[in-house]
């Protein structure tokens, strides 16, 4: 539901997976088949999609020969989810992120809803792959996958806390601009996001650090942070500074990350020893890539960790 940055990237990503159990059979987007097919095929950030994308008729597109129905309704209760026997709705509009909103998909006949953003309200459980996904209950009809930044932050925070014990900390998130900002100065509920995205570093709020407590409850009240939106279209970076209980040094911390990346967090966490920049992490599948050269320790108990992530893909 919604075929914007997240919806289109989800479909692109799915097409690269072999033997996936998922099949996209419907898209709800106000743009219709012409917009859906064109924006899926041509992408300013990712380049041309290496797939055969065609308009079949006024209500269908095809991707590599597989037909996908395209509908356009702003009211989820009017969507044909029951008729189409939809198992899972990927809720990617950023609008229906609370129980009353997301439940409209269930009312329309879908079995489950995955919200691709932080949920509003404590009644919707949040799961982050590699952190607490094992707690998932099949009885949950509506779940949240948290934000891109929480998916970056939580895996390596989990390692830090398990190995060294986090006392408290703050995060600065240097984040690429998003569609929620203005291209040129214009009205916005956030006066800073009202300013031209491609011309400014824009300080703004982020709930990502606090949201870590939703998947790692013992860290409730221990983390906070801010975001700086910068003039890049994709890939972001987290700079976390924490006080830890156990005395340590940079190499020991990096080794803990490497051990986790090779073991329990394989495919979720990675460690880079190379001097890379943001564009090098575009379309990186993992949730978080530690930049080992930037790990610092002051006084044996103040730790700085920097991690990259593709905020549209990881």
Curated annotation (Swiss-Prot):
A Pfam family reported for this protein in Swiss-Prot or TrEMBL: Gp_dh_C
InterPro entries: GlycerAld/Erythrose_P_DH, GlycerAld_3-P_DH_AS, GlycerAld_3-P_DH_cat, GlycerAld_3-P_DH_NAD(P)-bd, Glyceraldehyde-3-P_DH_1, NAD(P)-bd_dom_sf
GO BP term, pick one: glucose metabolic process
Gene3D superfamilies attached to this UniProt entry: Dihydrodipicolinate Reductase, domain 2, NAD(P)-binding Rossmann-like Domain
Other remarks in the entry: GAPDHB, the second subunit found in plants, is absent in algae. Algae contain three forms of GAPDH: two cytosolic forms which participate in glycolysis and one chloroplastic form which participates in photosynthesis. These three forms are encoded by distinct genes.
Similarity-based family: Belongs to the glyceraldehyde-3-phosphate dehydrogenase family.
Record-given protein name: Glyceraldehyde-3-phosphate dehydrogenase A, chloroplastic
Origin species: Scenedesmus vacuolatus
Native organism taxonomy: Eukaryota, Viridiplantae, Chlorophyta, core chlorophytes, Chlorophyceae
Gene name per UniProt: GapA
């Amino acid at each position: 539901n919604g075929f914007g940055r997240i919806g289109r990237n989800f479909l692109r990503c799915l097409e690269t997976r072999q033997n996936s159990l998922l099949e996209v059979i419907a898209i709800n987007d106000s743009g219709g088949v012409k917009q859906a097919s064109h924006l899926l095929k041509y992408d300013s950030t990712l380049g041309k999609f290496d797939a055969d994308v065609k308009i079949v008729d006024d209500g269908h597109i095809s991707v590599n020969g597989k037909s996908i129905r395209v509908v356009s309704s702003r009211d989820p209760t009017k969507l044909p989810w029951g008729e189409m026997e939809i198992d899972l709705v990927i809720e990617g509009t950023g609008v229906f992120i609370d129980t009353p909103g997301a439940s409209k998909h269930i009312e329309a006949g879908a079995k489950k809803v995955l919200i691709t953003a932080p949920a509003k309200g404590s009644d919707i459980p949040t799961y982050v792959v590699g952190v607490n996904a094992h707690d998932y209950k099949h009885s949950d009809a509506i779940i949240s996958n948290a934000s891109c930044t929480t998916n970056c932050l939580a895996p390596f925070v989990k390692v830090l806390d398990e190995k060294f014990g986090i006392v408290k900390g703050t995060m600065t998130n240097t984040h690429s601009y998003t569609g929620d900002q203005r291209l040129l100065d214009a009205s916005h509920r956030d006066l800073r996001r009202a300013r031209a995205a491609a011309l400014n570093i824009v300080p703004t709020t982020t709930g990502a650090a606090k949201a870590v407590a939703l998947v790692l409850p013992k860290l409730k009240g221990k983390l906070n942070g801010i975001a700086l939106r910068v003039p890049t279209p994709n890939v972001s970076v987290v700079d976390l500074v924490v006080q830890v209980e156990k005395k340590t040094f940079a190499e020991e911390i990096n080794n803990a990350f490497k051990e986790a990346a090779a073991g329990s967090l394989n495919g979720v966490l990675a460690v880079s020893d190379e001097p890379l920049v943001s564009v090098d992490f575009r379309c990186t599948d993992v949730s978080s890539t530690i930049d080992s050269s930037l790990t610092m320790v002051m006084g044996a108990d103040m730790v700085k960790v920097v991690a990259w992530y593709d905020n549209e893909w990881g």
